[in-house]
Swiss-Prot record:
Its EC number is 1.4.99.-. It holds the Pfam family DAO. Belongs to the DadA oxidoreductase family. It comes from Methylobacterium sp. (strain 4-46). FAD binds at residues 3-17. It catalyses: a D-alpha-amino acid + A + H2O = a 2-oxocarboxylate + AH2 + NH4(+). GO terms for molecular function: D-amino-acid dehydrogenase activity. The gene is dadA. Oxidative deamination of D-amino acids. It comes from the Bacteria. Coiled coil: none annotated. This is D-amino acid dehydrogenase. Pathway: Amino-acid degradation; D-alanine degradation; NH(3) and pyruvate from D-alanine: step 1/1.
Length: 421
């Protein structure tokens, strides 16, 4: 079957890989000059099934109000007259109940665990290298209140058989020895030993090369303008230059830009761009740098080791599609790093980056069939695109091929939002 994949980030390229592996003739379109150059370019680097949780959770509305007042706030909301944003926020607030949180976290962990296993399988099949480490994630708590609420997450982890360790400060230092230098900064942590780290951009580029070896065609520098459709099926993709490309199946994997593409077809995807920032800097002292990923729970900042580099990622900024680099957001990332790993890297040589994470109100991606018989979506992964990419691509390839996916998939499809739309 001829399949057009729209989007060349980590989600689009993994989709192409699994489709090609299933025997399909695949073409990938992306407006950038190469693979993984937008949201996948400099994300936090975590592959974190254990940390997969919706932002919509009990207590979040009150926490959000406090965050907005912090100097180094993890959440930034720019006042703007944008009905889509306020509708999205209303849906998110509706998911801040305990029942919704347990349901959403459960399905996110289900996909993330499957995806981590799929990534390991892919690594075994291909030998792909991308500065990966299998040394877990340490969620670090600076306050006793944060530590006391860890049971909200461990109950779901128990239900899905996800390994974890609740650690005292000495246990945290055993996992991340450099933290001994800042022993008074934290009171404990939650370690997720099954988590991994890796450079999503490097992975995406190298997987694209492997896809090309399998016959996948990449057309970079091609912007998608609109979809043609007739009688409940997509009949073609029109590019910005007016060229129309045709296939038998179509995959919309354009991240935050997917809703605008599908809206003229009557499909309303509640995916909003949540802007994140990162710093990437060289390691200057091995013994003072992180071993894997440390998640600073106070500032919601992830500090990740990627080979001879440190990646510091975080902040949730609701500012539409703006990709302006803002100094205060950089200051928050620098504050977290200097608090926890003050001698680990050289901030004077850091590169500052921002990207738009495609977020749904319930935190769960939108993967699967649509109301159009040959149109599929693979978007809405939020901060977990790298974590969920392989599992989403593998699940989607099974659906397009007519095979039953290896995990329950119905609750990831676009139709869960149709009634609300």
């Amino acid at each position: 079957m001829r399949v057009l994949v729209l989007g060349g980030g980590v989600v689009g390229v993994t989709s192409a890989y699994y489709l090609a592996r299933a025997g399909h003739e695949v073409t990938v379109l992306d407006r950038q000059p190469g693979a993984g150059l937008e949201t996948s370019f400099a994300n936090a680097g975590q592959v974190s099934p254990g940390y997969s949780a919706p932002w919509a959770a009990p207590g979040i509305p009150l926490k959000a109000m406090k965050w907005l007042m912090m100097r180094h706030r993890p959440l930034v909301l720019w006042p703007q007259l944008e009905p889509r944003l306020y509708g999205w926020l209303a849906r998110m607030l509706a998911n801040c109940t305990q029942e919704a949180y347990q349901r959403n976290k459960g399905r996110m962990v289900r996909l993330a665990e499957f995806s981590r296993d799929a990534l390991r399988d892919l690594r075994g099949e291909t030998g792909i290298a991308y500065d990966h480490r299998e040394k877990g994630t340490l969620q670090l708590f600076r306050t006793r209140k944060q530590l006391d609420h860890v049971g909200d997450d461990t109950r779901v982890l128990d239900a899905y058989g996800v390994a974890y360790e609740v650690l005292d400060p000495e246990g945290c230092i055993a996992a991340e020895p450099a933290l001994a230098r800042v022993r008074d900064t934290f009171v404990g942590g939650l370690r997720l030993p099954g988590d991994e780290t890796g450079d999503a951009h490097l992975f995406t580029q190298r997987l694209a090369a492997l896809c090309a070896d399998r016959g996948v065609r990449f057309r970079f520098g091609v912007a998608v303008a609109r979809l043609h459709h007739e009688a409940g099926r997509v009949t073609g993709v029109e590019t910005a230059t007016g060229e129309v490309l045709r296939a038998e199946a179509y995959v919309a994997a354009m991240g935050s830009y997917t809703p605008a593409l599908l809206r003229p077809l009557g499909l309303s995807l509640p995916v909003y761009p949540v802007k994140g920032y990162s710093l990437t800097l060289p390691v200057t002292d091995e013994g003072s740098a992180p071993v894997s990923t440390v998640m600073d729970e106070t500032y919601k900042v992830a500090i990740t080791r990627l080979g001879d580099r440190i990646r510091v990622g975080g902040t949730a900024e609701l500012a539409g599609f703006s990709q302006a680099l803002r100094g205060p957001r950089r200051a928050t990332l620098e504050r977290s790093l200097t608090d926890l790993f003050p001698a680990g890297g050289d901030l004077s040589r850091a590169t500052f980056w921002t990207g738009l994470r495609p977020m749904t109100p319930d935190g769960t991606p939108i993967v699967g069939a649509t109301a159009y018989g040959n149109l599929y979506t693979n978007t809405g992964h939020g901060t977990l695109g790298w974590t969920m990419a392989c599992g989403s691509g593998r699940m989607l390839a099974d659906l397009i091929t007519g095979r039953h996916p290896e995990i329950a998939h119905e609750d990831f499809a676009e139709r869960r939002y149709r009634r609300a739309a």
